[in-house]
Swiss-Prot record:
Residues 1-38 are annotated as: Disordered. Belongs to the TMA7 family. PANTHER family: TRANSLATION MACHINERY-ASSOCIATED PROTEIN 7. It comes from Homo sapiens. InterPro entries: TMA7. It holds the Pfam family TMA7. The gene is TMA7B. This is Translation machinery-associated protein 7B.
Amino acid sequence: MSSHEGGKKKALKQPKKQAKEMDEEEKAFKQKQKEEQKKLEVLKAKVVGKGPLATGGIKKSGKK
């Protein structure tokens, strides 16, 4: 009987590459993303306090 190995020979996950030095552009981009995220969180907090702006869902008519 021949031995049959199942699965893949190669590892599924590639080894992590060394963290390269970030360029100034990359640093600026990440900083901008963080600022945008903070702004969104502040806006979400304000909206939660006010309640629903529009009631969605099924509209019921007064007729029976």
